[in-house]
A protein has these predicted regions:
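A structural detector for beta-sheet-dominated domains
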Residues: 29, 38, 113, 129-131, ...
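Conserved polar/disulfide-associated segments of primarily extracytoplasmic proteins
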Residues: 47-139, 151
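A short, surface-exposed beta-strand/turn
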Residues: 141-148
Length: 176
């Protein structure tokens, strides 16, 4: 085998062992928001306590390279004012941080792409550290926005976050 042939075989072997992310465009049900996920999403629902009230939340998400990525949607009550929506989003944020004993470690401004929909303006991409269900340290980045009568949460959890994963995920958020 020549050196060139050996290098080709070695490169193919290395690439076969290197996990790659297969980013795909996803539109979670009941929203016009588009996002990128590195794997085929699963869908589910559960209740989340927001303020003093249990609220139904629909989720779409998947796991890839040790990261859990999800889009969650909480419908607002009919006739909710913008102030009530923002208060509910803040309460959901507090509940999400409390669920994994999270402490905010930083924030970044995030501007979501928008073609025709009213742009929600700059959002806060929150970084936090906490404890996972297994009792081990967990990192997270999350953002909330109010759109189409619902609060939308985009979130990534991992023992150690990869900037490639989080940056691609949040950059992929887009309104129509």
């Amino acid at each position: 085998m020549t050196l060139k042939q050996w290098l080709v075989v070695a490169a193919l072997g290395i690439s076969a062992c290197t996990p790659s992310l297969n980013w795909r465009e996803v539109r979670p049900e009941n929203t016009s928001l588009k996002t990128l996920l590195p794997c085929k999403p699963d869908h589910g629902s559960r209740s989340v306590t927001v303020g003093q009230q249990d609220m139904p939340v629909s989720m779409s998400g998947c796991e890839a390279q040790g990261h859990l990525l999800a889009i969650a949607r909480l419908p607002l009550p009919p006739g909710a004012t913008p102030e009530q929506a923002m208060q509910a989003a803040k309460q959901w944020q507090e509940a999400a941080l409390a669920n994994f004993k999270g402490q905010v470690t930083g924030t970044q401004t995030l501007q979501i792409k928008s073609k025709d929909a009213p742009n929600p303006g700059p959002l806060q991409r929150i970084s936090a550290t906490g404890v996972g269900p297994d009792g081990k340290p967990m990192q997270s980045q999350m953002v909330w926005l109010v759109h189409e009568g619902q609060i939308i949460q985009a979130v990534v959890y991992a023992p150690k976050l990869s900037a490639e994963v989080t940056d691609t995920f949040f950059a992929g958020l887009e309104l129509p």
